[in-house]
């Protein structure tokens, strides 16, 4: 059987650029071991957004060579080219975290290119990355969420005092303030009282034009890996135990320094009710957001009430050596390489389903 041509896209004009490089290293290594695909490594420059074809995915970002003769051109209806040569890509595995990677942008472009793509499509990606609209949709399905409000920068500037009053009355303090469309806890801060809230909101608006504010609670952090298209598999949840951090921020997530006091428990120590609730909510969340391929769905269990809440959804979860997503899959018997291979198979499956529909009518002369 001839090998399929696979393009691994990583990097990106994103705050999570460096995390993407680390994820890509793991996936590239797995693809090399599988030896089932001709792998084309596509690096997106953080500053310019230019796409470069690399020989491999280096462990050290400093070794990435941005050769002008290796600039990638994408021409809808024709293909993906380097130096006027069609690479004849059969499937793309995007591992660009955050904006342009998880917001439906790359997914939309690949749909126009008519190339199968690992992971969710435009709709699921675009909704999931926007914390505010995602929460509004999940709320309409009666899925339990941490109490929240959201607003645009324009509305906030028109009525600062009214919004601050709403925060006090609806949520009370402390609250956690988040940019609506960023991951890896970037731009997130905690306001413990009214004197701190304005600074926290302004910091979040530096990253996004929409801000989400949630009630801050003492809670256990539970994560759940999900894969599949129509048929969905929910993996055994894991727990993140944070010892020296107020919340699971960027440093807690990605620091590899000795003494980083974050512990991963897989499986999470859950009673039967919590386990069933989390799996049920993960299933319905995946379905109602029309997710495909994979997702990591994060939960909170409030310590004071023992109630379970959906926290956030990641349509392209981290694949680094310390990421929970692959570790939860591995716990249930799906090792890293098999997971990567399965996700590629799901991309072909999703593409085939999409091609079954009628996209246009031919007019008879």
Swiss-Prot record:
Mg(2+) 1 binds at residues 298, 312. PROSITE patterns: ATP_GRASP, DALA_DALA_LIGASE_1, DALA_DALA_LIGASE_2. Keywords: ATP-binding, Cell shape, Cell wall biogenesis/degradation, Cytoplasm, Ligase, Magnesium, Manganese, Metal-binding, Nucleotide-binding, Peptidoglycan synthesis. ATP binds at residues 168-223. One of its GO terms (biological process) is peptidoglycan biosynthetic process. Its EC number is 6.3.2.4. It comes from the Bacteria. Pathway: Cell wall biogenesis; peptidoglycan biosynthesis. Mg(2+) 2 binds at residues 312, 314. The keyword Nucleotidyltransferase does not apply. Belongs to the D-alanine--D-alanine ligase family. Cell wall formation. This is D-alanine--D-alanine ligase. It comes from Borrelia turicatae (strain 91E135). The lineage of its organism: Bacteria, Pseudomonadati, Spirochaetota, Spirochaetia, Spirochaetales. The gene is ddl.
């Amino acid at each position: 059987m001839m090998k399929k041509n696979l393009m691994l896209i990583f990097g990106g004009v994103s705050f999570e650029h460096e995390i993407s490089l680390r994820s890509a290293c793991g996936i590239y290594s797995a693809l090399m071991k599988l030896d089932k695909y001709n792998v084309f490594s596509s690096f997106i420059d953080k500053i310019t957004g230019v796409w470069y074809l690399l020989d491999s995915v280096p462990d050290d970002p400093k070794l990435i060579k941005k050769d002008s003769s290796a600039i990638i051109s994408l021409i809808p209806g024709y293909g993906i080219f380097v130096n006027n040569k069609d690479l004849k890509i059969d499937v793309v595995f995007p591992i660009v975290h955050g904006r342009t990677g998880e917001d439906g942008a790359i997914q939309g472009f690949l749909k126009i290119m008519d190339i199968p793509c690992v992971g969710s499509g435009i709709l699921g990606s675009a909704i999931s990355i926007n914390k505010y609209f995602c929460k509004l949709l999940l709320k309409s399905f009666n899925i339990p969420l941490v109490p929240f409000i959201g607003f645009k920068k324009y509305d906030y500037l028109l009525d600062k005092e009214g919004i601050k009053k709403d925060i006090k009355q609806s949520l009370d303090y402390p609250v956690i303030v988040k940019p609506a469309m960023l991951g890896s806890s970037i731009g997130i801060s905690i306001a413990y009282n009214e004197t701190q809230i304005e600074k926290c909101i302004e910091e979040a608006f530096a990253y996004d034009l929409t801000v989400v504010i949630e009630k801050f609670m003492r809670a256990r952090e539970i994560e759940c890996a999900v894969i599949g298209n129509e048929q969905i598999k929910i993996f055994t949840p894991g727990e993140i135990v944070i010892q020296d951090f107020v919340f699971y921020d960027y440093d807690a997530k990605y620091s590899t320094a000795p003494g980083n006091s974050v512990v991963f428990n897989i499986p999470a120590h859950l009673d039967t009710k919590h386990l069933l609730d989390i799996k049920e909510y993960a299933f319905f969340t995946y379905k109602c957001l029309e997710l495909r391929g994979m997702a990591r769905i994060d939960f909170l269990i409030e310590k004071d009430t023992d109630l379970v809440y959906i926290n956030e959804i990641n349509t392209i979860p981290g694949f680094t050596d310390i990421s929970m997503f692959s570790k939860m899959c591995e716990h249930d018997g799906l090792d890293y390489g098999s997971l990567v291979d399965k996700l590629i198979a799901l991309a072909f499956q999703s593409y085939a389903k999409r091609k079954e529909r009628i996209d246009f009518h031919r007019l008879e002369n």
